[in-house]
């Protein structure tokens, strides 16, 4: 009986993970203002190379915070850049 519940729970989790992956794929191009993006993710969303994003961050064109050796960019900063 317990194994039946475990198997059903596992199947449900697999379904939920698949649904979440599908939602990410369908809506993945939308920039979420409160999400934090890496420079690579930002480059993909903006349709440019990562190095271009890093140059823009260093020039102050796109606002970002340096965390360790990497930059993190708030989605609202990407939206702000795109609306210029």
UniProtKB/Swiss-Prot annotation:
User: Beyond the main fields, what else does the record say?
Assistant: This bacteria makes up to 60 cubo-octahedral magnetosomes of about 45 nm in diameter which contain membrane-bound crystals of magnetite (Fe(3)O(4)). Expression of just the minimal mamAB gene cluster (MGMSRv2__2365 to MGMSRv2__2381), including this gene, is sufficient to form a minimal magnetosome chain with small magnetite particles.
**What is the purpose of this protein?**
May play a role in controlling magnetite number and size. Coexpression of mamLQRBIEMO in a deletion of the 17 gene mamAB operon restores magnetosome vesicle formation but not magnetite biosynthesis.
Q: Which UniProt keywords apply?
A: Biomineralization, Magnetosome
Report disulfide bridges, numbered on this chain. none
* One Gene Ontology cellular component annotation held by this UniProt entry: magnetosome
Q: Name one Pfam family in it.
A: HTH_17
Tell me what organism the protein belongs to.
Answer: Magnetospirillum gryphiswaldense (strain DSM 6361 / JCM 21280 / NBRC 15271 / MSR-1)
Source taxon at top rank: Bacteria
Spell out the NCBIfam families in the cross-references. Answer: excise (TIGR01764), MamR (NF040990)
Does Transferase show up as a keyword for this record?
A: no
Q: What is this protein called?
A: Magnetosome protein MamR
* Induction annotation: Part of the probable 17 gene mamAB operon.
Q: Which family does it belong to?
A: Belongs to the magnetosome MamR family.
Report the subcellular localization.
Magnetosome
Q: Does the keyword Ribonucleoprotein apply?
A: no
Query: If researchers knock out this gene, what phenotype do they report?
Result: Normal magnetic response, slightly smaller, sometime scattered magnetosomes. Deletion of approximately 80 kb of DNA, including this operon, leads to cells that are non-magnetic, lack internal membrane systems, grow poorly, have reduced mobility and take-up and accumulate iron poorly.
Q: GO terms for molecular function, please?
A: DNA binding
């Amino acid at each position: 009986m317990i194994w039946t519940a475990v198997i059903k729970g596992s199947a449900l989790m697999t379904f939920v993970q698949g649904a979440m992956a599908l939602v990410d794929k369908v809506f993945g191009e939308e920039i979420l203002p409160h999400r934090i993006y890496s420079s690579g993710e930002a480059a993909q969303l903006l349709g440019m190379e990562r190095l271009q994003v890093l140059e823009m961050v260093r020039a102050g064109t796109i606002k970002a915070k340096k965390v360790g050796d990497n930059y993190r960019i708030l989605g609202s900063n990407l939206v702000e850049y795109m609306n210029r």
